């Protein structure tokens, strides 16, 4: 009995070490921007966010009362990685806020990053845009990539009045995405992977089922354009079709294009279709 009593603190320490290792292993790599939106009328902003955390971003106004977009990267990304979209969307008449999520780029650190926290940061960006004099606060949209796309759909599911969402390479369900990632690391689902999935849900405070794009899309009422690379090996294009199939009504359009998860090749060839969708749903400047 005494041996077991003395062993309990050691087991607790060991278990705590396992959980710490999981959190560190899943934490995003922080990559700081090296470039800027050269040639555009940008200004650097720090947006006050959730938990008092400051979010770094580039604000690119397009004139008075322009429709505006929050543009958010994926896991381990930053605002610079979304720069290929900036010039053509600005030329089309949109004001832009390219934002770093917490724990990414030049934004503040926090206890952890997650899809729901990406969503909080997107909403912070939308609220900030809505009060800028150059922006028409009634015509706001979101462009998100990967985790940022899933977060954009989560925001759309609970924010009435949002004008449009463009989802780039969204996964259908976080559990499926994590199981693929764990398998790529040769981590068996049972029992290790199953424990990791349960632990992550406990830490972030959400069940994966409640934040999965294939579930949240049923509550989205604004127009959505799902864009997916046909050669995406990280998130198969079929997952975009799953999301579309789960939507109610005809609010969701699907555009499958050449490219992988992070590289869509000639962005200039595809941006016209994104711009057309956004102009149709948010309208033109003025």
How should these model regions be labeled?
Residues 2-48, 55-58:
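An N-terminal hydrophobic leader/cap segment in hydrolases
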Residues 86-108:
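Conserved alpha/beta-hydrolase
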Residues 134-146:
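Alpha/beta-hydrolase fold nucleophile elbow
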Residues 233-239, 266:
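Conserved alpha/beta-hydrolase "acid-adjacent" motif
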């Amino acid at each position: 009995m005494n041996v077991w009593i003395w062993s309990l603190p050691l087991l607790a320490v060991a278990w705590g070490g396992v959980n710490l290792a999981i959190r560190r292993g899943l934490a995003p790599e922080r990559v700081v921007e090296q470039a800027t939106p050269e040639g555009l009328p940008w200004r650097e902003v720090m947006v006050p966010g959730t938990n008092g955390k400051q979010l770094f971003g580039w604000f690119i106004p397009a004139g008075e009362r322009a429709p505006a977009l929050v543009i958010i990267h994926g896991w381990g990304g930053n605002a610079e990685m979304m720069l290929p979209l900036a010039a053509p969307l600005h030329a089309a008449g949109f004001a832009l806020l390219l934002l770093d999520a917490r724990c990414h780029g030049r934004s503040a650190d926090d206890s952890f990053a997650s899809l729901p926290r990406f969503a909080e940061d997107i909403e912070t960006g939308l609220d900030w845009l809505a009060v800028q004099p150059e922006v028409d606060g009634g015509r706001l949209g979101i462009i998100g990539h990967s985790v940022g796309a899933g977060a954009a759909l989560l925001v759309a599911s609970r924010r009435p009045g949002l004008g449009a969402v463009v989802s780039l390479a969204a996964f259908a369900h976080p559990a499926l995405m994590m199981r693929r990632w764990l398998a790529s690391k040769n981590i068996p689902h049972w029992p290790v992977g199953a424990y990791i999935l349960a632990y992550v849900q406990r830490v972030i405070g959400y069940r994966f089922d409640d934040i999965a794009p294939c579930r949240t899309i049923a509550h989205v009422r604004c127009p959505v354009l799902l864009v997916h690379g046909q050669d995406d090996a990280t998130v198969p294009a079929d997952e975009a079709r799953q999301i579309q199939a789960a939507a109610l009504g005809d609010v969701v359009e699907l555009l499958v294009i050449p490219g992988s998860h992070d590289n869509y090749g000639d962005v200039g060839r595809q941006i016209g279709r994104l711009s057309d969708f956004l102009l149709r749903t948010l309208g033109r400047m003025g």
